[in-house]
Amino acid sequence: MKSVLKIRMSAHDAHYGGGLVDGARMLQLFGDVATELLIMNDGDEGLFKAYDMVEFMAPVFAGDYIEVEGSITEQGNTSRKMIFEARKVIVPRTDINDSACDVLETPIVVCRASGTCVVPKDKQRK
């Protein structure tokens, strides 16, 4: 089972100079993917317990399109182990003009993570 979201980073997402987006934004998107996976798997939003690993691999800027994918890799009674990957798939080309963008032939992996979510037994509906 997997979930995929695609979202454009806005000027509001930019936190640092040069339009750089805070890495925590990727973790927020991983949380959204995890929530969708838990709803699909258990019929409940569940709770994110912990990240086992987070690796930031490339910068993200306002205007970038990010595709976020996650999947459940292990399932216990209440725990769900998951992996996540965020990839930059479209980038602005302000060097050409203010509205130009390119679809990347090869997406750039910007962040990877793994973690554990929990759905209490009494809230599992599937």
Swiss-Prot record:
It is an enzyme of class 4 (lyase). Its EC number is 4.3.1.14. It catalyses: (3S)-3-aminobutanoyl-CoA = (2E)-butenoyl-CoA + NH4(+). Keywords: Lyase. One of its GO terms (biological process) is L-lysine catabolic process to acetate. Pathway: Amino-acid degradation; L-lysine degradation via acetate pathway. GO terms for molecular function: 3-aminobutyryl-CoA ammonia-lyase activity. Homohexamer. Belongs to the KAL family. Involved in the anaerobic fermentation of lysine. Catalyzes the deamination of L-3-aminobutyryl-CoA to produce crotonoyl-CoA. This is 3-aminobutyryl-CoA ammonia lyase. It comes from Acetoanaerobium sticklandii (strain ATCC 12662 / DSM 519 / JCM 1433 / CCUG 9281 / NCIMB 10654 / HF). The gene is kal.
